[in-house]
Each structure stands twice: as structure tokens, then as C-alpha cells.
Amino acid sequence: MATKLWDKGFEPDKMIEEYTVGNDRELDMRLARYDVQGSLAHIAMLETIGLLTAGELEKLTAGLKEIAAEIEAGRFEIEPGTEDVHSQVELMLTRRLGDAGKKIHSGRSRNDQVLVDLKLFLRDELRQTAEAVKTVFDRLQTLSEQYKDCLLYTSDAA
């Protein structure tokens, strides 16, 4: 089994570990597509400041797009023993591209990754919520126009 990022050299009680980790894997799966989006933006920045070559950027971009396609197709999973979605994406890239895959985390902390993922996720959720509210609003507008002459809607008013 892989060493956990937060491993301090002792084995925690399994019940405590299960309680503190909870359903992180399921939540991470919901963030996977946003992790890839954040990584695509990050590697573009790494290339502009000279930490990636143009060739590495091209390979990493293609690799991340492959992972994004796997996520959308429902074929992406966080392997047992892999800490989280960030580690899984890096592991997949490293397997496919070698050391270039390890470079996607240069210059950013885990907290940076989590915050970017959450920001992108919440932005998407808010957009979807706004669209749903607009749909309800439009329907209410249509109904109000349809029944504007009715003082009180009844089933026989139509």
C-alpha cells in the first residue's frame, strides 16, 4: 500500500482513520474534472515561466485531456492506496509520461489544488442553479400571463 501523504510513521486506529477520512473518495470523484481543469491552467503557467518545455506542456496537456475523457466516460477511479484525486491524476500522468507527470504539482500546494477544485466546482454548481432558477422563473412568467385574468387559480379556470 502506498504511504499516505500525512503519514507520521505510526498506524492510526482504523476506526479513527475511517471516521476522519469519511467519504473523501466520493467527494474527490466529484472534483476530478475540476482538478484536471485546474491542472491544465497550471501547466500552461509553468510553461510560460520556463518550468516546463513546450514538449512537456504538449504531452501533459494531451495526458490531462485523456484523463478528462476517462472522467466524463465514468472510467476514472481513485485506486486503493492512492491518497486523493490529486495524487491519482499525478500517478496516471507519471505512469503514462514518466517524470514529466510529476511536474504538474510544481509551484502549488495541496491547499492550492483543493481551493481551485472547489472554486471551479462551486462556480459550475452556481451556474446550474441559476439556470434552474431561470427555468422556474420563466415558467412562472408564462403561467402568470396565461392566468392574468383569474383572481384565483382553480382547476376549472382553464
In which residue ranges do the predicted regions lie?
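A helix-coil-helix interface module used to build multimeric assemblies
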Residues: 1-155
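Active-site-proximal glycine-rich helix-loop-beta segment
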Residues: 158
